[in-house]
């Protein structure tokens, strides 16, 4: 399997990848010159890519190597800093904060729950501090570092949750939606 090949200790058999890039571009919009799809290549698609640990720093095929970047690297750095400063797991604390959410306006006559959908494998929710309008976050309940590590039940839960997210966002008027994975190394 790919996971076994990625974890191979024999360098001649190991795949040179250490992270994944997984995501969707979904939707279309109307522009004065006609319909446009949500991607530079004008496709509704789902992508899977394996990211190498290093890439050539200069000319292809020669020169020094440098670490490749994946968006999950920033999250990994934050999670490590969080543990170093608090002694706690960020994701465990994040899940606890999500479950114990309270309204910032102090009202008790309105819902305080940020969860859109949840099951035994995942939780889809509105983050307390959104970075963009209508942002939703999807988090696995188990220690799944990337899509390759997800078992069938977790992948099914991810698919179901993403479908729910697309339906919710499009019902609110969203026409162009991007989904990305922040994977571990």
Regions found by a protein language model. Name each.
Residues 1-185:
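HIT superfamily nucleotide-processing domains
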